C-alpha cells in the first residue's frame, strides 16, 4: 500500500511536469502537425504511467485519466480544438481540464437551489446501495450467489463506484476552479436505447472527446467515398472500435497479459447494433416500442453481452476479487482512522 502511494505521487508529479511542457512550450508551436509532433513524448509518457501501479483502481483511474482522456484532449489541442483551446488562462486550469474528466457546464441550472437537495438525497441513496454491496461481499458472496446474480450485482458496483469517484472529482474541481461542471453520468439505468445509453447517459466525458477526435474526422473522410448517410455510420463504428481498444488497453494495465480482444468485440457488437437501431428509427413506418419495454430490452442486452464478452477476461484473472478486496481494504483503513480520531 505504501509503495502504491509513493508511485501515486511520482505519477502525478510526472503528469504535472508533462502538462507544464504542453502549456509553456507546445502551445507556442503553430497548430497542426508540428504541434502534434511536439506532443508525441507526452503521449508516450501518459501511455506508460499506469504501469507504475499494481492496484486495480489506480491502474484503471490513471489509464482513464491520462492514457485515454488526457491523450485525446492533447491530440485535439494539437489542432486547436476544445476543450484545451482556446488556451486556459493559467497552468492550473490547463492541467485540470487536461487530466481530469471534467467539462464546464455552459448552461447551469436556473434553479440550482431547488435541484441541489434532491441530488444530495440521490447521492446518499447510491452510497447506501454501495455500502450494502460491500456488506454482501464481506459475507462470502462467492459461496451463495449464482454467476448471473453476482454479475448483476457487480455491474451495479461498477456503475456506482465509477459515478461516486467521478462525482467526487467533479465536485473537487468545481471548488478549485470556481465553476459548475457538467455531470459525468445521467441516470444510465433510464436509457431506452443503446444510442441514448452510450451518447447521453453513460460516462459522458468519453463521447465528449471521441466525437471530435474520432467520429467527426472519420465521417468527413468517408463522406466523399460513401455519402453523408453511410459516413455517419462509419464514424460511429470507428468510435466504438476505438473505445473498445482503449478498454482493451486498460484491461492490459490491470491484468498484464496479452489481449484476448473480447472487450473490443463487445464494443464492436454494440456499435453495429447501435447503427442498426438508428437505421430502424429512421424508418418512420416501424412502430415505436413503449419506454418500459425498450428500457428492459436494453438492460437485458447490456447484461447478456457484458457477461458474454466484457467480464470473462476479468473473471478468468480474478480482477473482480482484487477490486472487492481493495474496496474492503479502504473501508477498513478508514474505520481504523476514524476510531483512532474518536479515541
Swiss-Prot record:
Coiled coil: none annotated. It catalyses: a long chain fatty alcohol + a fatty acyl-CoA = a wax ester + CoA. This is Probable long-chain-alcohol O-fatty-acyltransferase 2. It is a multi-pass membrane protein. InterPro entries: Wax_synthase, Wax_synthase_dom, Wax_synthase_Magnoliopsida. Catalyzes the final step in the synthesis of long-chain linear esters (waxes). One of its GO terms (molecular function) is long-chain-alcohol O-fatty-acyltransferase activity. Its EC number is 2.3.1.75. GO terms for cellular component: membrane. The lineage of its organism: Eukaryota, Viridiplantae, Streptophyta, Embryophyta, Tracheophyta. Belongs to the wax synthase family. One of its GO terms (biological process) is lipid metabolic process. The keyword Cytoplasm does not apply. The chain crosses the membrane at residues 7-27, 36-56, 58-78, 117-137, 148-168, 235-255, 260-280, 292-312. It comes from the Eukaryota. It comes from Arabidopsis thaliana (Mouse-ear cress). Keywords: Acyltransferase, Lipid biosynthesis, Lipid metabolism, Membrane, Transferase, Transmembrane, Transmembrane helix. The gene is AT2.
Amino acid at each position: 500500500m505504501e509503495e502504491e502511494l509513493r508511485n501515486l505521487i511520482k505519477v502525478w508529479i510526472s503528469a504535472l511536469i508533462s502538462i507544464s511542457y504542453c502549456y509553456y512550450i507546445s502551445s507556442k508551436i503553430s497548430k497542426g502537425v508540428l504541434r502534434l509532433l511536439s506532443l508525441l513524448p507526452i503521449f508516450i509518457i501518459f501511455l506508460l504511467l499506469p504501469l507504475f501501479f499494481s492496484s486495480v483502481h489506480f491502474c484503471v483511474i490513471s489509464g482513464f485519466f491520462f492514457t485515454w482522456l488526457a491523450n485525446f484532449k492533447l491530440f485535439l489541442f494539437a489542432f486547436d480544438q476544445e476543450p484545451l483551446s482556446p488556451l486556459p488562462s493559467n497552468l492550473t486550469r490547463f492541467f485540470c481540464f487536461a487530466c481530469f474528466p471534467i467539462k464546464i457546464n455552459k448552461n447551469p441550472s436556473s434553479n440550482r437551489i431547488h435541484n441541489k437537495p434532491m441530488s444530495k438525497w440521490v447521492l446518499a441513496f447510491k452510497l447506501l446501495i454501495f455500502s450494502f454491496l460491500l456488506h454482501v461481499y464481506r459475507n462470502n458472496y462467492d459461496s451463495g450467489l449464482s454467476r448471473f446474480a453476482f454479475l448483476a450485482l457487480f455491474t451495479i458496483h461498477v456503475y456506482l463506484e465509477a459515478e461516486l469517484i467521478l462525482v467526487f472529482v467533479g465536485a473537487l474541481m468545481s471548488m478549485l476552479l470556481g465553476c459548475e461542471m457538467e455531470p459525468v453520468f445521467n441516470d444510465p439505468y433510464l436509457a431506452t436505447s443503446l444510442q441514448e445509453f452510450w451518447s447521453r447517459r453513460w460516462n459522458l466525458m468519453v463521447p465528449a472527446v471521441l466525437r471530435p477526435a474520432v467520429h467527426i474526422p472519420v465521417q468527413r473522410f468517408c463522406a466523399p467515398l460513401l455519402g453523408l448517410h453511410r459516413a455517419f455510420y462509419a464514424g460511429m463504428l470507428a468510435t466504438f472500435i476505438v473505445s473498445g481498444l482503449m478498454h482493451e488497453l486498460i484491461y492490459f494495465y490491470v491484468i498484464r497479459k496479452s489481449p484476448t480482444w473480447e472487450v473490443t468485440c463487445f464494443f464492436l457488437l454494440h456499435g453495429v447494433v447501435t447503427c442498426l437501431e438508428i437505421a430502424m428509427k429512421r424508418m418512420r413506418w416501424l412502430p415505436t416500442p413503449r419506454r418500459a419495454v425498450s428500457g428492459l430490452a436494453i438492460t437485458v442486452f447490456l447484461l447478456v453481452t457484458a457477461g458474454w464478452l466484457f467480464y470473462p477476461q476479468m473473471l478468468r484473472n480474478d480482477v473482480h476479487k482484487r477490486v472487492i478486496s481493495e474496496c474492503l481494504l479502504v473501508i477498513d483503513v478508514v474505520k481504523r482512522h476514524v476510531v483512532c480520531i474518536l479515541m
